[in-house]
Design a protein with these regions (language model features):
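Compact, glycine-rich, soluble single-domain proteins
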Residues: 1-73
Length: 73
C-alpha cells in the first residue's frame, strides 16, 4: 500500500521509501524511515497535497511524493 492511499485518520507504518536524490534524503530527515508510524491528518480541498503526522510533526506531501512511500497497516 502506498502512503497516498491512506484516508484521513488512518495510521500505518512505513515499510519502504522509494524516493532517491534530494527529496529522498529530505523525507528521511523528516522521519520517513522504516518502522515509523504515520497518520493522514488532512487533505487539501483539491485533493493534493495530503498532510501526514510523523515523529510529532505534520508534513504536507504531494501525491506524487507520497506514492513513493510504501506503508503497511
Amino acid at each position: 500500500m502506498r502512503l497516498r492511499e491512506l484516508s484521513v485518520g488512518e495510521t500505518a507504518r512505513v515499510t519502504e521509501l522509494r524516493q532517491w536524490g534530494a527529496m529522498g534524503r529530505r523525507l528521511r530527515e523528516l522521519g520517513f524511515l522504516e518502522g515509523e508510524s504515520v497518520t493522514c491528518v488532512g487533505v487539501s480541498p483539491l485533493g493534493d497535497p495530503h498532510a501526514y503526522r510523523i515523529c510529532g510533526a505534520v508534513i504536507a506531501l504531494r501525491n506524487c511524493d507520497a506514492a513513493r512511500v510504501e506503508v503497511a497497516p
